[in-house]
């Protein structure tokens, strides 16, 4: 099982008529942990009954025949997905990647505030907005967890994400040496969405540094349309005065959601 911690909570009566195994094969585990004892291997297209969802992780308790156990929720295919009032965006799979986490704090502001805190807060706000639109959205982490860098694009590739967004805040290495937000892309398949979100970000109160090529592992190893957004400089007094505010994080989240809606619809 993948060791990525995410969140994938559905209202079953709204989203499923019948859950089905989507991967070639997955483990049915005795407990919601990748280190758990394996009860059996489930095969693609097997039908299961969902008994319980752990809303703080990506694990679901399921029943198949007389066996009960736990599976990773992103390996369950959604059937009869409810697209009412959501349009084509509701048919997409979006992966949100809050940068850093756990032992990796990322960069820091002059007061010691850590990048990992604000990437998570911002991504969670996007997650909430997308879920309200019935979007199939997966997060690489939803708490202060350590997530291996390579596993982030691996998850995007595995679930065949239609869009992958990695959230970050920048650092110039010297106080007040640079400022502004920036959108990075690596592969050509991300060009269109990178331009869309950059235009939407124009109403942010920070300087627009534009769209740039970014040779980052989470983009380079990602076969899906993937971007990385640096939403301001942690070591800029001006930028950080906004970064630390929930209202700025919400504004970024609103713009990301509007960009996705525009891109798909």
Regions found by a protein language model. Name each.
Residues 166, 184, 212-265:
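Active-site-adjacent mobile loop/cap segments within catalytic or ligand-binding domains
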Residues 137, 208, 226:
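Hydrophobic anchor at the start of a short beta-strand
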Residues 32-37, 145:
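Short alpha-helix capping/helix-loop boundary micro-motifs
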Residues 80-195, 200-203:
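Catalytic-core regions of hydrolytic enzymes
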Residues 1-30, 38-44, 53, 77-88:
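SH3-family beta-barrel domains
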């Amino acid at each position: 099982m993948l060791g990525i911690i995410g969140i994938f909570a559905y209202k079953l009566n709204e989203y499923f008529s019948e859950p089905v195994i989507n991967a070639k094969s997955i483990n049915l585990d005795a407990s919601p942990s990748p280190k758990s004892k394996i009860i059996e291997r489930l095969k693609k297209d097997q039908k299961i009954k969902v008994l319980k969802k752990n809303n703080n992780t990506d694990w679901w308790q399921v029943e198949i025949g007389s066996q009960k156990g736990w599976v990773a929720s992103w390996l369950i295919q959604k059937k009869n997905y409810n697209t009412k009032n959501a349009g084509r965006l509701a048919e997409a799979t979006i992966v949100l990647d809050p940068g850093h986490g756990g032992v990796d704090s990322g960069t820091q502001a002059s007061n010691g505030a850590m990048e990992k805190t604000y990437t998570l807060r911002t991504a969670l706000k996007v997650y909430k907005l997308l879920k309200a639109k019935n979007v199939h959205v997966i997060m690489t982490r939803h708490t202060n967890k350590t997530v291996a860098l390579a596993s982030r694009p691996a998850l995007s590739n595995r679930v065949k994400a239609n869009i992958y967004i990695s959230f970050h805040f920048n650092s110039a290495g010297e106080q007040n040496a640079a400022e502004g937000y920036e959108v990075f892309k690596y592969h050509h398949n991300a060009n269109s969405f990178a331009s869309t979100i950059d235009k939407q970000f124009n109403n942010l109160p920070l300087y627009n540094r534009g769209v740039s090529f970014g040779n980052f592992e989470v983009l380079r190893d990602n076969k899906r349309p993937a971007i990385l957004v640096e939403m301001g400089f942690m070591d800029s007094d001006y930028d950080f005065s906004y970064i630390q505010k929930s209202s700025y994080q919400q504004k970024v989240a609103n713009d990301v959601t509007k960009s996705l809606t525009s891109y798909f619809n």
